[in-house]
C-alpha cells in the first residue's frame, strides 16, 4: 500500500514512517502543505496521513480541496487539538478518521489497517506465491497451510519482495523501506533478514543478484 505522510514534526514523522514501513507499506513523507498538495497532484496514494497544523498550507485546507476535487483518497487526520469541535471540523471536512497526539504507534498502525479495509469495502488482497501466503490484514504468513512466525522486519521485507515479484530490489532500496534514514543500521542487516527468511521459508524463494540486490521470481502460471 502506498501512503502519503504529511507531518512537519521531524521526530514524529520519522517514527511514523518507520512504523508504517514495518507494516510493509511504501511511505512518501513530506513536511509542509504545499509539498503534500504537489504530491497528491503528481502521484496516486492509497491513504493520506495528514497533520492538521502543517506550515505553508493547513491540513484542513488540503483536505477540503481534496474533497472539492472529488478525490476519495482515505484520510487519517493527526492533530494536537483534542476539543470536540476540532474533531467535528476535521470529520466534516472529509476526514475518514481522526487521531489525537500523542498516540501509540500500534494504534496508528491498527487504524490504518482498519481504514483501508473499511474504505475499500473488502479485506486487503493476500499475496500468494505457490504454497506461501501472506495476509496484509492480519499479518499472518503461512507455508503449505502452516503458520510461520516472522519478526516485524522479516515480515516487512517479505511483503515488499512479494509485492515486487519479478523485480530485483537493491540493498539500498530495501534498507530505505525498512529503516528510513536511521543511521544505526548494521551494514549486513538486509543479509541477516534474508538469511532468516530463507531458514524459515526455504532457500529457493529469495534470489540473490550479486552486486545488485534481492528478488522473488514471479510464480509459474
From Swiss-Prot:
InterPro entries: CheY-like_superfamily, OmpR/PhoB-type_DNA-bd, Sig_transdc_resp-reg_C-effctor, Sig_transdc_resp-reg_receiver, WalR-like, WH-like_DNA-bd_sf. Pfam families: Response_reg (PF00072), Trans_reg_C (PF00486). Residues 124-218 bind DNA. It comes from the Bacteria. Keywords: Cytoplasm, DNA-binding, Phosphoprotein, Transcription, Transcription regulation, Two-component regulatory system. It is found in: Cytoplasm. One of its GO terms (molecular function) is phosphorelay response regulator activity. One of its GO terms (cellular component) is protein-DNA complex. The modification 4-aspartylphosphate is found at residue 51. One of its GO terms (biological process) is phosphorelay signal transduction system. Disruption phenotype: Deletion leads to transcriptional alteration of multiple genes including a large number of genes involved in metal transport, such as the feoAB operon involved in ferrous iron uptake and the mgtE and mgtA operons involved in Mg(2+) transport. Induction: By cationic antimicrobial peptides and by Mg(2+)-limiting conditions. Gene3D superfamilies: 3.40.50.2300, 6.10.250.690, Winged helix-like DNA-binding domain superfamily/Winged helix DNA-binding domain. Residues 2-116 form the Response regulatory domain. Member of the two-component regulatory system PmrA/PmrB that plays a role in the regulation of resistance towards polymyxin B and cationic antimicrobial peptides in response to limiting concentrations of Mg(2+). Functions as a transcriptional activator by direct binding to a cis-acting sequence upstream of the target gene promoters including lipase lipA and pmrH promoters. Also autoregulates its own pmrAB operon under Mg(2+)-limiting conditions. PANTHER family: REGULATOR OF RPOS (PTHR48111), TRANSCRIPTIONAL REGULATORY PROTEIN QSEB (PTHR48111:SF35). This is Response regulator protein PmrA.
